[in-house]
Amino acid sequence: MKKKYLSVNSNYVLYKTEELLDAASNRYKITVQIANRAKRRRYEDIDLLEEVTLKPIVRAVLEMAEEISQPEIISD
Protein backbone atom coordinates (compact mmCIF):
# COMPACT_ATOMS: atom_id res chain seq x y z
CA MET A 1 0.00 0.00 0.00
CA LYS A 2 1.49 3.29 -1.11
CA LYS A 3 1.20 6.21 1.30
CA LYS A 4 -0.28 9.48 0.14
CA TYR A 5 1.71 12.54 1.12
CA LEU A 6 0.73 16.16 1.20
CA SER A 7 2.43 18.30 -1.41
CA VAL A 8 4.73 20.96 0.02
CA ASN A 9 6.36 23.79 -1.86
CA SER A 10 9.86 22.49 -2.58
CA ASN A 11 11.34 26.01 -2.57
CA TYR A 12 10.07 26.48 0.99
CA VAL A 13 11.68 23.21 2.08
CA LEU A 14 14.97 24.19 0.41
CA TYR A 15 14.88 27.59 2.10
CA LYS A 16 14.33 25.98 5.51
CA THR A 17 17.10 23.46 4.84
CA GLU A 18 19.55 26.24 4.00
CA GLU A 19 18.43 28.11 7.11
CA LEU A 20 19.25 25.06 9.21
CA LEU A 21 22.63 24.51 7.57
CA ASP A 22 23.58 28.17 7.98
CA ALA A 23 22.71 28.11 11.69
CA ALA A 24 24.65 24.91 12.39
CA SER A 25 28.34 24.98 13.14
CA ASN A 26 28.84 21.49 11.70
CA ARG A 27 26.94 20.59 8.51
CA TYR A 28 27.61 16.88 8.89
CA LYS A 29 26.28 16.79 12.44
CA ILE A 30 23.04 18.63 11.59
CA THR A 31 22.53 16.34 8.58
CA VAL A 32 22.87 13.28 10.81
CA GLN A 33 20.47 14.81 13.36
CA ILE A 34 17.88 15.42 10.63
CA ALA A 35 18.28 11.88 9.31
CA ASN A 36 17.95 10.35 12.78
CA ARG A 37 14.84 12.39 13.54
CA ALA A 38 13.27 11.39 10.23
CA LYS A 39 14.09 7.73 10.85
CA ARG A 40 12.62 7.87 14.34
CA ARG A 41 9.48 9.61 13.03
CA ARG A 42 9.06 7.03 10.30
CA TYR A 43 8.95 4.21 12.81
CA GLU A 44 6.63 6.18 15.10
CA ASP A 45 4.24 6.77 12.19
CA ILE A 46 3.97 3.05 11.46
CA ASP A 47 1.87 2.69 14.59
CA LEU A 48 -0.52 5.44 13.54
CA LEU A 49 -3.49 4.43 11.45
CA GLU A 50 -4.15 7.90 10.11
CA GLU A 51 -2.58 9.07 6.87
CA VAL A 52 0.85 10.62 7.04
CA THR A 53 0.80 14.15 5.69
CA LEU A 54 4.50 14.76 5.07
CA LYS A 55 7.43 12.54 4.27
CA PRO A 56 9.52 11.96 7.40
CA ILE A 57 12.60 13.77 6.07
CA VAL A 58 10.60 16.86 5.08
CA ARG A 59 8.82 16.87 8.44
CA ALA A 60 12.18 16.61 10.25
CA VAL A 61 13.64 19.54 8.30
CA LEU A 62 10.61 21.73 8.95
CA GLU A 63 10.45 20.84 12.64
CA MET A 64 14.14 21.50 13.18
CA ALA A 65 13.93 24.78 11.28
CA GLU A 66 11.15 25.86 13.64
CA GLU A 67 13.33 24.95 16.60
CA ILE A 68 16.19 27.06 15.28
CA SER A 69 15.42 29.70 17.90
CA GLN A 70 16.55 27.17 20.53
CA PRO A 71 20.33 26.93 19.98
CA GLU A 72 20.84 24.08 22.46
CA ILE A 73 19.06 21.71 20.06
CA ILE A 74 21.41 22.48 17.18
CA SER A 75 24.59 22.59 19.24
CA ASP A 76 24.08 19.14 20.82
Curated annotation (Swiss-Prot):
Molecular function as annotated in GO: DNA binding; DNA-directed RNA polymerase activity
Subcellular location, record wording: Plastid, Chloroplast
Nucleotidyltransferase keyword on record: yes
GO cellular component entries: chloroplast; DNA-directed RNA polymerase complex; mitochondrion
Catalytic function, reaction form: RNA(n) + a ribonucleoside 5'-triphosphate = RNA(n+1) + diphosphate
Enzyme class name: transferase
Main location: plastid
SUPFAM superfamilies recorded: RPB6/omega subunit-like
Keyword Transferase carried by entry: yes
HAMAP family associated with the record: RNApol_bact_RpoZ (MF_00366)
NCBIfam families reported in the protein's UniProt record: PRK00392.2-5
Protein family (similarity comment): Belongs to the RNA polymerase subunit omega family.
Known role: May be involved in RNA polymerase activity.
Protein name: Putative DNA-directed RNA polymerase subunit omega
Organism: Guillardia theta (Cryptophyte)
